[in-house]
Amino acid sequence: MRKFDKVTFFALIVIWSFQIFGAIGILFWNRQWFIDMTPLTLIMYFFILFHKNWDDRKKVTFLLLTFSWGILAEIIGVNTGLIFGSYEYGQTLGFQIMNVPLVMGIIWVVTSLICGTIASQIKVRTPIQIFIAVSLMLILDVLIEPIAPKIDMWSFDHSSGGAPLSNYITWALVALPLQTYFIVNRL
């Protein structure tokens, strides 16, 4: 099991603080300003989490694979409806390529890194750590799905009444190889 160093621990505290401050800001202060800052905040999280990993070949490989795998899944998904269901992205997440905000790749990297790191701290066998990491990613997806359309991040076809069950199943399946790579390589 890897231990958190002080810098990583501080980085996670900063990220959680921004999340709490952002939620409070959206609920009680200038909602639109906080929503507009979402892409910038996600990019900041990315750099906070990878601040000391640019010389680690395995971590850079993980970053590139995760970004590419996540963007590819989203491009196929949003343009065909085959992977996650019928959905589209709004304007909140910023610049889009092939109908997918570029920041979605960063979201896949950040959530994969955080969930994999948490799971890797638990003293259980590798397959259980992978299961925990994928489950944490799935929990994040379940929590964000009802909020995303309200802040124009993405929305599913209105006839489906929200995210279909297949979205959650395939989200876990897309996350599985990422978490397997992360846990097996002890990143």
Language-model region placement:
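Aromatic-rich, lipid-facing transmembrane alpha helices and their immediate juxtamembrane interface loops
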Residues: 1-187
